[in-house]
Amino acid sequence: MSPLIKLAASSRLHDATHYVLCPFAGGGSGAFRHWRTLSLENEVISVMLYPGREFRIDDPTVINIGTLAEEMIQALKTCNQRIEDTIIVGHSMGAQVAYEASKKLVNQGLFLKGLIISGCQAPHIKGRRLLGECDDKTFIHNLVEIGGCDPSLAKSPEWWPIFLPALRADFTATEQYIFTSLPNDKEGLPIPTLLISGDQDREANFSEIEEWKLWCNKVVDHLVVEGGHFYITEQPQMMLECIRALSTETTA
């Protein structure tokens, strides 16, 4: 079964633009349930499901962003939508996966319609909240504080063996994704890219996200939206308008 889960689609699918969501660490399709209610116009929305959760609960977890990117590429190549009609929307850890997938596709001569990098500091900037070495209790406490975990999980340690493996794998992957040197101009990603920051996001601020311009040669804009770190799941209509803005920019 494909790890790409279709969330919503318009009735007309010929030459539809495909928006593929790459979730944050610990995220699954359920986190994007409100995206299913969006009204679309010749558009398809899918979400990438990482190993170790939902119907992939028995799949081995992955602790490498590049491996997750390769998995996404294979899913894109085998789905019914054309890669040149696809915009990948990566949020937090998902932005790292999206960027790596975009870069690998370019190296294969395949060019996406666009890339959106949301809520994620640039690859040469270390995250301010590192959880990989925390004990389970501290790890869960931090997830609740960020807003990426149901508070009830902190009071239900009997569920931890089920949820923690995927959560810890994701955080290991994202925390290991750090580069000590910057790319040169020729190495910058040559596809249209939109940056998005949340005005109340404490995990990745505007200046840290702005630094992606050193990695992407065709940044068309850097939008600031209302919300904390999880604006992508809390305000799907607003995010859809941001995506459409990039889609229009690349079509013009």
From Swiss-Prot:
The active site is at 92, 229. Disruption phenotype: Deletion results in a decrease of anguibactin production and in a moderate attenuation of virulence. Its EC number is 3.1.2.-. It is an enzyme of class 3 (hydrolase). Pathway: Siderophore biosynthesis; anguibactin biosynthesis. The keyword Repeat does not apply. InterPro entries: AB_hydrolase_fold, TEII, Thioesterase. It comes from the Bacteria. GO terms for biological process: lipid biosynthetic process. The keyword Signal does not apply. Keywords: Hydrolase, Plasmid, Virulence. GO terms for molecular function: hydrolase activity. Transmembrane segments: none annotated. Pfam families: Thioesterase. Belongs to the thioesterase family. Probable thioesterase. Involved in anguibactin production, but is not essential for virulence or iron transport gene expression. This is Probable anguibactin biosynthesis thioesterase AngT. The gene is angT.
